[in-house]
Amino acid sequence: MVILDGKLVSKTRKQLVKQQIDIYLNKGYRKPKLAVILIGNDQASELYVSNKIKACNLVGIESMLLRFDENINSQTLSDQINQLNNDQLVDAILLQLPLPKHLNEQMFLQAITPLKDVDGFHYINQGKMLEGYDTIYPCTPIGIINLLKAYNVDVKSKDITIIGTSNIVGKPLAIMLSNMGATVSMCNKNTKSLKKYTKISDIVISATGKQFIITKDMIKKNAIVIDVGIIRDPITNKIVGDVDFENVKELCSYITPVPGGVGPMTVAMLLENTLQLYKKHIKE
């Protein structure tokens, strides 16, 4: 059994981002700039944003945090996004999710110009992804794919089950893996028997946020298991995932830990996406 070490792989990729940025800075170019919009006081969002900003600072990306009260109205948020869209010194815009219930997430994600859409959620970028064109990919799905590549795992011809069909992880990941030649099954809350799908899968990817939904009896021998879940165990207060790691790992050929698996890769991909958008802007 091999641990898919997202911390290690992400560290290497962050170093490469920093090296590329240093080359541009030495040529006299400005720093890349990421604008982050954070609304409300959600503790998880606060932590995620803090980690993203720290990562930016380490590689030489300038970050700008725009904080708003959870009662912000739609017009104010729309005006702020438009201002960032038109700011020539801002390369990438991140709208931290989830938004308060009175705000339409899709409307505001689509308000971000695709030229600064660091999360790859704009319809134009998603359409390019669907057709197999190079584009800005959503951070967690491309992070998972690059983690597998780092360990020379070829997904072509593999049977893969994805549990969770969100627009952020499950759906884009299914498209990307299909484009790479995998056979993908998607399971959701209405799926009658998860085990029916997971038990025959070469790779199982769980992104539900439900603690230990994936158990030993659901996995075939030598399967690869990717755990996207991040949950605080109410009893131990430790961070755990969707997968019952200690019992499942003995069956696996490869498995991601929680924490230290998918999470660090997501942050590294945010930095890479910011760099990619920056390169396009300074060429224009």
From Swiss-Prot:
Superkingdom per UniProt: Bacteria
Binding site for NADP(+): G164, T165, S166, I230
A GO BP annotation: methionine biosynthetic process
Cross-referenced InterPro entries: Aminoacid_DH-like_N_sf, NAD(P)-bd_dom_sf, THF_DH/CycHdrlase, THF_DH/CycHdrlase_cat_dom, THF_DH/CycHdrlase_CS, THF_DH/CycHdrlase_NAD-bd_dom
Keyword annotations of the record: Amino-acid biosynthesis, Histidine biosynthesis, Hydrolase, Methionine biosynthesis, Multifunctional enzyme, NADP, One-carbon metabolism, Oxidoreductase, Purine biosynthesis
Molecular functions (GO terms): methenyltetrahydrofolate cyclohydrolase activity; methylenetetrahydrofolate dehydrogenase (NADP+) activity
Entry EC no(s): 1.5.1.5, 3.5.4.9
GO cellular component annotations of the record: cytosol
Reactions mediated catalytically: (6R)-5,10-methylene-5,6,7,8-tetrahydrofolate + NADP(+) = (6R)-5,10-methenyltetrahydrofolate + NADPH; (6R)-5,10-methenyltetrahydrofolate + H2O = (6R)-10-formyltetrahydrofolate + H(+)
Pathway: One-carbon metabolism; tetrahydrofolate interconversion
Disulfide-linked positions: none
Quaternary structure and interacting proteins, as annotated: Homodimer.
Annotated function: Catalyzes the oxidation of 5,10-methylenetetrahydrofolate to 5,10-methenyltetrahydrofolate and then the hydrolysis of 5,10-methenyltetrahydrofolate to 10-formyltetrahydrofolate.
Family of this protein: Belongs to the tetrahydrofolate dehydrogenase/cyclohydrolase family.
PANTHER family reported for this sequence: C-1-TETRAHYDROFOLATE SYNTHASE, CYTOPLASMIC, C-1-TETRAHYDROFOLATE SYNTHASE, CYTOPLASMIC-RELATED
Name assigned to this protein: Bifunctional protein FolD
Annotated source species: Mycoplasma capricolum subsp. capricolum (strain California kid / ATCC 27343 / NCTC 10154)
Gene: folD
